[in-house]
Each structure stands twice: as structure tokens, then as C-alpha cells.
């Protein structure tokens, strides 16, 4: 496992690169398969394929390969907000930037168009003007973007406030807290299983263990028991299972390919698990072919630079 010396500017940039590029590549790879494949299908993942969207109910449109989706766009917008606030969480600013993405396609892999939008996120930002706290609104839309907060010294309260801009139910908020702790422990050099158990121990609220009794030692579960839906607990379990299942998924490529082969919400699960895998195995573990096929590399590198300046000397 890679251990990052946060006294070193080079290692801070390497950690930022792992999160930004590890997530974007997983997102772009998974986007072409979201709800288009079934578990057990034979898939050639050597190159990315384009995603399909519906501009009208009966009019599908194929987008170019390599585009990343709302998962990465909202992460980039969050990093931009944190950069403007010198690392502080500013929920009004976050909401404004996410709205700019939704309405004008800012922070998007496709100029002028928001690629992929979740229902809860859209309602919270464009209709309600506040986060949705219904138990039925526990999608993975805040978990998918929370990773920068793991690296910028955000408190658990700050992580939950950021989630609540769109996803305000306690389950979604605490899932974000748990994942941030997992990323921090991985960055310290802990092995994935140790990092996951320590992350669960750092969460001061029992709600996750109330809604899921499978989180501890989740790597012991067979694949048939892993659900790859957009429900935040399913996503959290799937990502933790992929990253901690070290005998089967022992590098970045294996983790992300495993995420896509689970089918279902392939882009988000590959994005979130890909961030953690790149932190654990280093950004150099991301296959160069996938990197070269990922949209807007200059923007991603700029975001890496932004995030690296926000990482404190100790997480």
C-alpha cells in the first residue's frame, strides 16, 4: 500500500491525483455500461465506450467515449468551492456551483451540457432550494462527490453539511463520513481491510450499522450478495467490498473492472471505488490507456493542482 508523506508537496499532489484521476477514469469507464449490461456478461474493458442518453423518451443518443458524468462534475465543483474558501465548507457556494453545472454545463466533460443528473440532486437544487431529507431520497448522489472533503481537513459535521445540500437524510450523510474516514486511513498507508474497519470505528453514529449488518468484514460476502444499485448503502457496501477484497481485486484496474462487472450503477460505483483504489495503490496504477481516453485531461490536472494546495500536513 502507498503511504503519503503529507509534509511533502509532491506527495500531496500525488494523493490529489489519486482521488481526481482515480475517480474520473472509473466514472468514464463505467459510464458506457450503466444499466446497459448484466452481471455475468462478457465485457471487453480494454477501451472505453460511449454512454447512451435519451434527449427524448424514444430518441437515444450515443455520446463519445471517455466522458465522465455528474459524479466527477460535482466533485470538481466541490473542489472549486473549497479552493475559493481556502478549504472551508461553504454550502451556499457549493449549491451555486452545482446549480451552474446543472443549468449551464459548467464543470462538465461535455461543454454546455450536464452529463447525467440524479433526481434528488435536481429537485434539491432547482425545485426545493434545500436538501431532501426523506428516507426515500437516500441515493448515492452525495457519496459520489464527497472525496475532496476527506483530504481537506473537513470535520464530520462539515462532511454532513455538504451532503445535506442535496441529500439530507442521516443515512446518506453518515455514509459520506464513513467514506471520508476510509480514504484518510488509506492515505496513511493502512491496508484496505484495516482502513475500512478503522473508518467504521471512527464514525460516531450507529445509523449505518442499523441499516446494514454487513459492513464489518464485508469482504467475506460472496459477489451474489453485493447489490450495485444507486441506494447509498448498496453503493457504500459495493465499493467497500471491491476495495477490501484484496485477493480478488489487487490493483486499481481490477477494482474498477470489478465495479463495472457488478453492473447496475456502474459509473458511480467505479468512480467511488476507483478513488479509493488509486489512493491505496497510487495514481501510477491507473492504466495509461484509460487515462489517455478520459475527457478533458487538462481540466483534471488543473483540479489536481487545486486540491493538492488544500491538503493539510496531517489528516
Give residue ranges: language-model regions.
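Structured, active/binding-site neighborhoods that engage oxygen-rich ligands
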Residues: 1-315
Amino acid at each position: 500500500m502507498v503511504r503519503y508523506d503529507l509534509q511533502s508537496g509532491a506527495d500531496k499532489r500525488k494523493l490529489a491525483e489519486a482521488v481526481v484521476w482515480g475517480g474520473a477514469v472509473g466514472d468514464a469507464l463505467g459510464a458506457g455500461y450503466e444499466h446497459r449490461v448484466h452481471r455475468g456478461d462478457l465485457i471487453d474493458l480494454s477501451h472505453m465506450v460511449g454512454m447512451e442518453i435519451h434527449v427524448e423518451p424514444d430518441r437515444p443518443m450515443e455520446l463519445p467515449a471517455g466522458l465522465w458524468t455528474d459524479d466527477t462534475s460535482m466533485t470538481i465543483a466541490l473542489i472549486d468551492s473549497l479552493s475559493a474558501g481556502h478549504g472551508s465548507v461553504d454550502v451556499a457556494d457549493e449549491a451555486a456551483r452545482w446549480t451552474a453545472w446543472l443549468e449551464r454545463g459548467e464543470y462538465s466533460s461535455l461543454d454546455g451540457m450536464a452529463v447525467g443528473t440524479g433526481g434528488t440532486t435536481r429537485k434539491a437544487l432547482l425545485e426545493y432550494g434545500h436538501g431532501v431529507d426523506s428516507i426515500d431520497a437516500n441515493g448515492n448522489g452525495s457519496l459520489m462527490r464527497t472525496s475532496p472533503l476527506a483530504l481537506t481537513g473537513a470535520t464530520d459535521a462539515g462532511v454532513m453539511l455538504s451532503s445535506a445540500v442535496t441529500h439530507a437524510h442521516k443515512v446518506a450523510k453518515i455514509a459520506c463520513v464513513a467514506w471520508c474516514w476510509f480514504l484518510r486511513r488509506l492515505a496513511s498507508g493502512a491496508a484496505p481491510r484495516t482502513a475500512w474497519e478503522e473508518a467504521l470505528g471512527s464514525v460516531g453514529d450507529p445509523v449505518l450499522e442499523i441499516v446494514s449488518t454487513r459492513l464489518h468484514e464485508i469482504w467475506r460476502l460472496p459477489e451474489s450478495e453485493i447489490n450495485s444499485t444507486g441506494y447509498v448503502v448498496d453503493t457504500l457496501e459495493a465499493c467497500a467490498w471491491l476495495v477490501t477484497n484484496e485477493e480478488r481485486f489487487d490493483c486499481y484496474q481490477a477494482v474498477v473492472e470489478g465495479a463495472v462487472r457488478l453492473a447496475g450503477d456502474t459509473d458511480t460505483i467505479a468512480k467511488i471505488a476507483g478513488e479509493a483504489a488509486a489512493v491505496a495503490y497510487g495514481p501510477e496504477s491507473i492504466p495509461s490507456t484509460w487515462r489517455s481516453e478520459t475527457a478533458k485531461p487538462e481540466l483534471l490536472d488543473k483540479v489536481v493542482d487545486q486540491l493538492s494546495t488544500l491538503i493539510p500536513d496531517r489528516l
